[in-house]
């Protein structure tokens, strides 16, 4: 996994307490479907799926995707909104990161669009941000997009199941709460989770490369 987020500004509720009407079983089934829906693998079959998926996203047939096309494709083609109400936030993070990195690759790519060269990269980031969102929402019991110290302490078994070693929950909270506000944002959690390589699904990603 490799993703870092910006400050969570969305007001959408988290998934942890089923405030969006989904139960744990529903989320697990949706998560498995999304794993199958996003062709991230470096295989000929997955690449062919990406070619077909790119064409479905590229409604204007320009050979490049603007953000609105990416967001629309994630809703209409991949149906990622079945998983979380925060699709726009997740896809925007992934789109921005992929196009920024893609524009630096051999001076190719566009600053405003994602081309096929960056498409797999973007899909990997979408998957990463979904995984980070799953973990954060499981910890954020209140659904307010902030994790307090008590929520973190209660989540220690989950953190350890995802691969973290937590010997001192209080010390970990101080480490995560970089600005000392008394709560941990999605951005702070995502940076730490990526650094320690937390894995919610047991399927570690390869380092994203070109299409």
From Swiss-Prot:
Keywords for the protein's UniProt record, in alphabetical order: Calcium, Cell projection, Cilium, Flagellum, Metal-binding, Repeat
Keyword Thylakoid: no
Positions of the EF-hand domain: 45-80, 81-116, 127-162, 164-199
Record SUPFAM superfamilies: EF-hand
Annotated region (Disordered), positions in chain: 1-29
GO CC term (a single one): motile cilium
InterPro entries assigned: Calflagin-bd, EF-hand-dom_pair, EF_Hand_1_Ca_BS, EF_hand_dom, FCABP_EF-hand
Gene3D superfamilies listed in its UniProt record: EF-hand
Phenotype when changing residue 86 to G: In strain: DM28C
Main location: other
Lineage: superkingdom: Eukaryota
Similarity-based family: Belongs to the calflagin family.
Record remark on domains: This protein has four EF-hand domains, three of which may be functional calcium-binding sites.
Protein name: Flagellar calcium-binding protein
Species annotation: Trypanosoma cruzi
Gene: FCABP
């Amino acid at each position: 996994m490799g993703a870092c987020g910006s400050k969570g500004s969305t007001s959408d509720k988290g998934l942890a307490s089923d405030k969006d009407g989904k139960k744990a079983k529903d989320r697990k089934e949706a998560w498995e479907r999304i794993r199958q829906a996003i062709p991230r693998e470096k295989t000929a079959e997955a690449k062919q799926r990406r070619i077909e998926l790119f064409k479905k996203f590229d409604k204007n047939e320009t050979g490049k995707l603007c953000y609105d096309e990416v967001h629309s494709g994630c809703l209409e083609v991949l149906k990622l909104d079945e998983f979380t109400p925060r699709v726009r936030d997740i896809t925007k993070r992934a789109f921005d990161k992929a196009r920024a990195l893609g524009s630096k690759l051999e001076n190719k790519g566009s600053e405003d669009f994602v081309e096929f060269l960056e498409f797999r990269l973007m899909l990997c980031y979408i998957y990463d941000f979904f995984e980070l969102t799953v973990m954060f929402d499981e910890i954020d019991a209140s659904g307010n997009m902030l994790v307090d110290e008590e929520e973190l302490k209660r989540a220690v078994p989950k953190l350890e199941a995802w691969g973290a070693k937590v010997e001192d929950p209080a010390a970990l909270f101080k480490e995560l709460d970089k600005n000392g506000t008394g709560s941990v944002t999605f951005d702070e959690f995502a940076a730490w989770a990526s650094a320690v390589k937390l894995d919610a699904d047991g399927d570690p990603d390869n380092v994203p490369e070109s299409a």
